[in-house]
Amino acid sequence: MVLIRVLANLLILQLSYAQKSSELVIGGDECNINEHPFLVLVYYDDYQCGGTLINEEWVLTAAHCNGENMEIYLGMHSKKVPNKDRRRRVPKEKFFCDSSKNYTKWNKDIMLIRLNRPVRKSAHIAPLSLPSSPPSVGSVCRIMGWGTISPTKVTLPDVPRCANINLLDYEVCRAVYPELPATSRTLCAGILEGGKDSCGGDSGGPLICNGQFQGIVSWGGDPCAQPHEPGLYTNVFDHLDWIKGIIAGNTDVTCPL
């Protein structure tokens, strides 16, 4: 069974805030308040996702995070404790590969959002650069988000959690998930022993490998963080021409096949 890593949250938000868990994304630690100025929190239709600010006006997330009444929060660390840098935006435009529904668990799970107003850089808001080179198998990668910190029950943290995982050969994921095609625009990442993973509510957030923004949280095993069940991440590098074309105003640009 696989899990799209988005999470219905509003009905459980109050309970989650009240809980104090020593469980560590899953298997990680509380992110340092200064290490994620590019990380955004996306709410829509009673669900939550993550996302990545790539310049003052654009956010990159997963296509399956699309929905109505979307709100995007930037400069956030604690959900409960506001800071002077926190900003709220809504989408001005959304862009997808072909259409908002033309994606699969292994292809085109990517959405580019133009904010209704640009944000200014500050101590807690700053974009993350797009990758300058392709990802390399064996890289140590950082995941982060406000998703559930328990693989078996929904427990949302007040602050984002961070963990290090490894970029694995795509064939590792093909062996686990037989529905995957021979090739795709998807990265395979995780810890084969289990215990560390992105999970529900982390969808759309970044996979940062050797300091470069290489992936977007997409889907994985259910429950999360199980041995030999790594996660799948949309390959950002493979979509660079599409991303840059859209930002430059070329709406005719197409995603890679």
UniProtKB/Swiss-Prot annotation:
One of its GO terms (biological process) is proteolysis. The active site is at 64 (charge relay system), 109 (charge relay system), 203 (charge relay system). Disulfide bonds join 31-162, 49-65, 97-255, 141-209, 173-188, 199-224. Its EC number is 3.4.21.-. Residues 19-24 form a propeptide. It is an enzyme of class 3 (hydrolase). Expressed by the venom gland. It comes from the Eukaryota. Glycans are attached at residue 102. Residues 25-248 form the Peptidase S1 domain. One of its GO terms (cellular component) is secretory granule. Keywords: Disulfide bond, Glycoprotein, Hemostasis impairing toxin, Hydrolase, Protease, Secreted, Serine protease, Signal, Toxin, Zymogen. Pfam families: Trypsin (PF00089). It is found in: Secreted. The keyword Hydrolase applies. Snake venom serine protease that may act in the hemostasis system of the prey. Monomer. PANTHER family: KALLIKREIN-1, KALLIKREIN-RELATED. Belongs to the peptidase S1 family. Snake venom subfamily. This is Snake venom serine protease serpentokallikrein-2. It comes from Protobothrops mucrosquamatus.
